Amino acid sequence: MEKDLNAALNIKIVNIKGVTKMAKENKPLKSILFVSRNKDNKHLPDFKERRYVRLTTKTAEELKKDFDNWSKQGREGEFCRFYMKINARDREMAKKKLIQELIFNDNFDLVSAEAKIAGIANKKECAAERKWLFDFDDTEDKLEEFINDIKDCDKASVPLEIEVHKTPNGHAVIVSRGFDTRELMNKWNATVELKKDEMLCVDWSGKEN
């Protein structure tokens, strides 16, 4: 009986581990960037840009503590940004591209492998989603008008999913797929930039100068 109980427990443990592993595999794979840019920190003498790039299955909320700790490693008064790719990455395509890189690039640097792998996964052919980002730098009172114009320009039978995010310099408007933007951009090209497989600034620290 004890043996049967142990066997049952072992089966349960194996199954739990299997479920955990499967859950991790099913989580969206995203590319992130922590960066303190030169142009954001011109007020600091002899400033040198810092950056940290990697792939992750964690959400922006789960990574906030990591970003805060990374920011604290910088200089006093340093302005730091946390970016996350709007589109999840295709794991299998990224693996294929990495294998090609390892085969054909004799100078592949193992020291910077993590950043290199993230760079490979960031290629547009490795995108698992097709979201677009509009970088909206107009005044906030124009935002609703812009979103309504997006809806009017999209002629598909299935409505777009639209997200709005505050950024350090304005707003980011993310749509769930592409559409014909010619009419939209003819009206808004002075204050809006379309960026397709782009990174979203999800958090920042310090005061921008």
Q: Could you describe each region identified by the protein language model?
A:
Residues 194-200:
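Extended, charge-rich low-complexity interaction segments
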Residues 9-167, 178-179, 185-186, 200-209:
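Signature for HUH/AEP ssDNA processing cores
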Residues 187-191:
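Polybasic, proline/glycine-rich intrinsically disordered low-complexity segments
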Residues 170-176:
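Catalytic nucleophile-His microenvironment captured as a short glycine-rich beta-strand/loop
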Residues 1-8:
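Positively charged, helix-rich recognition surfaces that bind polyanionic ligands
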